[in-house]
Amino acid sequence: MINIEDISKSSNQSEEKQLKSTSSKPKYSFAAKSLFKGSNNITPYYLSTSNTFQCVASESIQTWLLSDDGHIFTSSGNFVLDVSSGGYFVELVQLNSNSKTQIWTIDTTNNKIQNQGNGNYLDIDCFNICVAPLNGNATQQWTTFRRAPIPTGNWGYFQSKQLNSNNYWGLSVLNNSTSYNTSVVMNKVQAKSKGQIWQMTSDGHILSRLDGNLVLDIGPSINGSTTNYYLNTNVYKANDLMQQWGINENNQIFNQYYPNLCIGFVGQLGVDSTVNCVLAQPSSACDTYFQFIANPTYSLNQIVGEVPEPFPAYTSGDLLASYQYLSNDATSNFTDDIRSLYTGINVSLQSFLSIVTNATCPSSIHSTEDFSNVQNQIKTELIYAINVRLVFENYSGFYSKLFSQGSSNLTNLANLINVDMSSNQMVNANYTDAITSIFYSLISEIPVGGPIIANIGQSAVEFGELMSQSNYQGASTYQVELSQLYTHLNTNYENEMANAQSMKDTILQDWGMMSKTYALCFLPTNDPSSLNMNGLDFDEISDVASVAYEIAMIQMLLPTTYQIYFTPAGYWVPYSDGDFAYSDNSGTYIMATIEYSNSYPPKELTDKLWNNGVSKQEFFLSAYGWNLATSLTYYNNTKQHNNIFKLAFPTIKNFTGVPMQFVMTNEGDNLGNFTVKTHFAKFFSTYYSCGEAGHHYFDIAVTDINKNKVANFTVDIKLKALEGSYVSIKTGSLVVQPGYAVGNPICNQGSYSLMFSASILIPIYKSE
């Protein structure tokens, strides 16, 4: 049974099972809002897999996929709406293509959703979803719409809908402070300002790029008001509705605890350098002081998900004759269907346009009006197609240039890092992460212009994933032998080029998609949906992207040669700062080779890191794209810790948007508990005891911040006489909960002679 409930009573629940759909029909995303207002006459109700409430960031429970044969799927495509065996309540079940009760018709004119099995209409019964005969009640009226794009899982800006000249303003952490309880304000978006970049998580938190657990929160009341508050940052808290947000169809960011209050600002953009953000009630749905747009919007991703809209059909009479005449005339009698060439690579649409524009009605066509109508339509289509193709040609040129030196760049980096590219050593080569990091750099460093490239590129990535969704198995760690790394990267490069080409062709074969895409080509470059490349500095864009891709390749190669050596605060270390060292309150981190803790990287390598803006904190703590295992060592204090070579210290890397916790136990004894921030790694730094030669097993349990299980596994430490310990995950011990994936661990041996521990890094991903 599917329930309906207003926001004040709602709970954010998702599907409990993950079952594969067998449908291969195209699906189009939509949400359905009831026109029934309920007792409070304020809060809207939405069709949901659990409760129905205002549009939230965790839109999976309120987003539905309509297939072209009338099935309504959940957002993951795992279940469909069906009428129960009793013929009244609506429930979620697996697809049965032979069941008519699973087929629905959405009538957007009369706001009805009708079941084809029994002819009844979607209705509400005490906040439960049911079907009933047509009765004229508001409970049977539903308005369907596409959501305001929400950047769930992607980094970007929350930009005010009020544009200011060539600049735009966005939600900003004051002074880029990582301290909790810092004010959130409106500032003009600046390059390389992490305090203006956010990520909306699946549970509705809005993460700051400044730090792993820093989120948007409600601040103090304004003059004691219960309906007006300031905004600030805070540490990520579990099940705290004040930290959970949603975006409705009016582009308003509302709070889950105060659902009628939205984020806005007080002041004039462009007049004041900093404008205070508030949580208050908008004056109307169109109040631009309370409207924000996620930038980039990934508008192309939205467009290709639209219900297809065919070109105007010409099937008979002078309309058909006119279309065929113009097609033959423009293509020199190659085809009487000019639309079939919109996707052609070796054709000149500009030449076609010139011929069609100058064509005159032949005597064989009697209706000059029909001829003129067809001529104007084809001219419009050609103009649209020319501009759409130009957008993708510019993107393909950028993308090809970016990867044109791939082989030589990879070879040079391998030599610098001292990697044997002919070996069968495995490396984590996540191409999608590499591409995403490039788009992040463009967004961050070129706020006006960079999002346009990201809009196309990220949409192409997601379009490719959508096309292969039936084979999607969750997060891939792309384990590749070093000898096959270049081939792997090149294959993925070609696949992404093909994805962009396929997305372009999809748009060019659909009148609605082509019209919408054409409109984006002429938006101002600071509009978050813009595809307007006029005036973009492609040299600057290429430079930023090239550096980002080089950093991504370093992230792949570095763990094969180097690791981090950690020494707790208060102990002597050979270096506390410099090119290969970093210190914080917990201790000192030094980068050196896996075999020798006193063999440091060359300056040419560290210059590529620090001179290109890599954060030392993120690097040494294995945050975001960095994944270096961490070993524990005490250098000249080995007498006090002379068993260090016997030990292995795990590092858990959290690739998700939700904080995690892990505990390590040995035969029931708790050895330590640690919290892992979002997008960061956490090193198990508690000293413990281990036995003599042989295998020793330590159990690790990982949960999310809400205490839900994520993964369990056993670390196997193997000891040999006068050798550093060997470490691995015990075969058969790994248990991963649905919705997560555990990547291949990075395992490094300890050292008896240099007295450092073994290290193991275990990456955990979200699997959709």
From Swiss-Prot:
It is found in: Cytoplasm; Membrane. The keyword Membrane applies. PROSITE patterns: RICIN_B_LECTIN. Induction: Induced by high levels of extracellular Ca(2+). It comes from the Eukaryota. Keywords: Cytoplasm, Lectin, Membrane, Repeat. Its main location: cytoplasm. It is a peripheral membrane protein. Residues 1-107, 100-248 form the Ricin B-type lectin domain. One of its GO terms (cellular component) is membrane. GO terms for biological process: response to cation stress. Residues 1-22 are annotated as: Disordered. Coiled coil: none annotated. One of its GO terms (molecular function) is carbohydrate binding. May play an important role in stabilizing and/or regulating the cell membrane during Ca(2+) stress or certain stages of development. Belongs to the cup family. PANTHER family: CALCIUM UP-REGULATED PROTEIN A-RELATED. This is Calcium up-regulated protein G. It comes from Dictyostelium discoideum (Social amoeba). The gene is cupG.
